[in-house]
Amino acid sequence: MQRSLVGSEMCIRDRVETDIEVDPEAELAGVYRHVGAGGTVMRPTKIDGPAMIFNNIKNHKDARVVIGLLASRERVARLMGCKKEELGKLLCRAALNPIEPVVSEEKAPCQEVIHKVTDPDFDLFKLFPAPTNTPMDAGPYITMGMCYATHPDTGCSDVTIHRMCIQSKDELSIFLQPGSRHIGVMAERATELGQPLPISISIGVDPAIEVGSCFEPPTTPLGYNELSIAGAIRKTPVVLAPCVSIKENAIANAEYVIEGEIQPGIRVVEDQNTHTGYAMPEFPGYNGLASHECWLIKVKAVTHRKNPIMQTVIGPSEEHVNLAGIPTEASIYNMLEKALPGKVTNVYAHQSGGGKYMAVLQCRKTVHTDEGKQRQAALLAFSAFPELKHVILVDEDVDIFDTRDVLWAMNTRFQGDRDIITIPGVRCHPLDPSSDPVYSQSISDKGISCKTIFDCTVPFELKDKFARAKFMDIDEEKWKDFI
């Protein structure tokens, strides 16, 4: 599916391609930083830049790499078939109306070429043009791998994205933050049973799968298969194929599939080959620290299409913002529609928070008893997405997707002594470098934060005094060449 999308008209109009040889070790990411990374990447970088295909990868003559396919919200919307302002609502509807995946016994496109670990020349370093994002990375990373596994007790399956570093010719490290992702729960249970957890890692799939896989509880609790969200978006089930070396399924249309087993009770140091102290750049814009508690995947086989396309993402890029942020919007909107129907008209997980730390809520006040519900909505948003740190509340006449308009509301409809609500001592996200006891005495542990609400809405009784200047409605057809 991804291969057809990469070559489609909807993507090709903002895609660049090069035959210049590129080194996957830091150079590839360094080039795309300028071409279109955006997000929380240090400036200069291009916002809403094109996707980029590298056709000539050093030491990987038969492979190509695509990056930035989802680095523009406008492009994501085209790929999903909706307006960019409606992406969160589309994902919300899909999560509420799932279509479960199906398993096909037909020959899968992802298995055109098969490499087994028993082959004498099997080597992950040679099979994958996996990039390192910076010279400080722990090694080459699989950053767009759809990790698929099944709970050993319940038989329920799950798909999630995790960072995975190639550690040897047949080993990957996988970072599973304790208690935060379903595959981590599955691996812990398999360890209790003293058995490995079979896992497939599909790379280069339909963007609907990639975005859908980034949902988190409580919207998608343990037992909810996020592949069903992609099925709902496409109105047809995601097709799976049985793996060739393990008892698990993989996404049939993937470009690459890694088949392996998470080893019970084994932990490895993420930067064991480089000793830099760092893993890779993460979504907040800083280098993530290397973990000393990564789980180990022993790889059994790699399958791929002929002339495969490797897909990758830069951790702090706009692509990651969209992957994380659109499901965040959907989760928040879903909860608010249930608790306060019609009182929040849209949600934007702002790029400056990496799609996780900050949300802008567009609020509707129609009667005087709506006053205060906007702050209730903010509290509910924190419950819908626990990693959220800041919520900005604005009125219906503010474009939440335009930062300048949001800051206009903050400058003209906000007073710091009455419109800031702080909630200290709440668990948030460990990758926020300011959520550390050395930063603030109010923080008792790494990952604890002060959640903050910025209420930039007009008090209901003052609405008439805050009406924006109205301009004359014009004949848009008459002036269509200019507007």
Segments the model singles out, each with a brief description of its role:
Residues 148-153, 336-347, 374-381:
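Structured alpha-helical segments in the cores of large, soluble enzyme domains
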Residues 10, 214-217, 344:
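Accessory structured domains or lobes within enzymes
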Residues 16-45, 54, 80-81, 85-296, ...:
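Conserved mixed alpha/beta core segments that line enzyme active sites in large multi-domain catalysts
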